[in-house]
Amino acid sequence: MASNPMKPDPFPDALGHRRKVWFSGVLLACVAMLSPEGARTQESPQPGATLASPAPEALEVDASLFTAQSFDWFDSQRQRPVPAKLYLPAAQAAAGTLPLVVFSHGIGGSRDGYSYLGRYFAAHGVGSLHVQHVGSDRQIWSGNPLTLPARLSDAAQVSEALHRVQDLRYALDQILAAPAGALFDTRRIVAAGHSYGANTTMLISGAQVEQQGQKLSLRDPRISAAILISAPPFYGMGDPSKILSGIDVPTLHITATEDVIQIPGYVSGLQDRMDIFNATGSERAVPKVLAVFKDGSHSIFTDRAGTGGVNLNPRVKIATRQLALAFLNGILARDYRAMDAWPRSHASLVARFEKLEP
């Protein structure tokens, strides 16, 4: 989405001049791997949740275990819509007891995407707020195909990367002020994202980038942990340790051996994800976890079916959300049993698993 010259840009040139600096190669590469997510927009929840995780487990989540509500917020300060969808447990929860995940989608996504995670989290007692970023969302795929490169270029601007962080902040402000906000334990708020959304998650969790010699810190102190799925590097910013070493919250990193972003002249593969894992929090004594699936693809972690292998795709999705929930229970409830058991339960799928504790 291009800037409106009649609107003031809250990110002036001194901080975010409009060049494709951090994300251009990564975003355009993601487009080569991803198409708009196929996610159903209709939810038909009914009461009666259980916190027990069935095993073996179907990918589809019982609709009686969660509710879903869409919001169409508008940030008047930035003159920017902030759509979102909130998944909640169907079972009644006491005030101040629910953890909350705030999820950021990849390029071309929407609030309806990554529903396999949102529904599952809610069915297991965790709220999940999926935020839509209007400057890099599914609108990219609409319009004249000949102008798609221009729309992608707009999505790759530094100002859009910064807007995405502000989208998460604004959505978090709004949901905590809403009636549902009373349900959440504000000490247990976790940021999560896939691909471009993982970059957004790193920024709101404490990653520090430089722009024209000025260091930008976009850390939101309400974030207590982060889940990074298929995280690309900060393109053109050099050593990731300079950006990520100061992150001071626990992190979960999920990728696959074939999690590769590739276009002519640019390749980002597993080693980039490993470099991000190694750099994250390297100056801090904070826990971090890495899971690398065998094979797969970059888009296997979206709602798309079949990518990365028709049989492998649902198995990786199920294992991903089980690990994410185990991470949340470990970090937020100090219950590490499920996380410790996870690599054994999914040994046939996992190429590498690391759990680093201070």
Predicted features and spans:
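Bacterial N-terminal signal peptides
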Residues: 24-33
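N-terminal cap/lid segment of alpha/beta-hydrolase-fold proteins
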Residues: 45-96
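Short substrate-entry loop that stabilizes the transition state in hydrolases
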Residues: 93-96, 103-140, 235-236, 261-264
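Primarily recognizes the serine-hydrolase "nucleophile elbow" in alpha/beta-hydrolase
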Residues: 171-246
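Alpha/beta-hydrolase-fold serine-hydrolase catalytic core, especially in secreted/extracellular enzymes
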Residues: 293-358
